Amino acid sequence: KWCFRVCYRGICYRKCR
């Protein structure tokens, strides 16, 4: 499983695949 940070329009969150 890979987790990485996603930032969009000033909001960052963690996404895992």
Curated annotation (Swiss-Prot):
Organism phylogeny: Eukaryota, Metazoa, Ecdysozoa, Arthropoda, Chelicerata
Family: Belongs to the tachyplesin/polyphemusin family.
Top-level taxon in the UniProt lineage: Eukaryota
Disulfide bond entries: 3-16, 7-12
Gene Ontology cellular-component terms listed: extracellular region
Residue(s) carrying Arginine amide: 17
Keywords: Amidation, Antibiotic, Antimicrobial, Disulfide bond, Secreted
Cell compartments where the protein resides: Secreted
Protein's name in the database: Tachyplesin-3
Gene Ontology process terms (BP): defense response to bacterium
Tissue: Hemocytes.
Function: Significantly inhibits the growth of Gram-negative and Gram-positive bacteria.
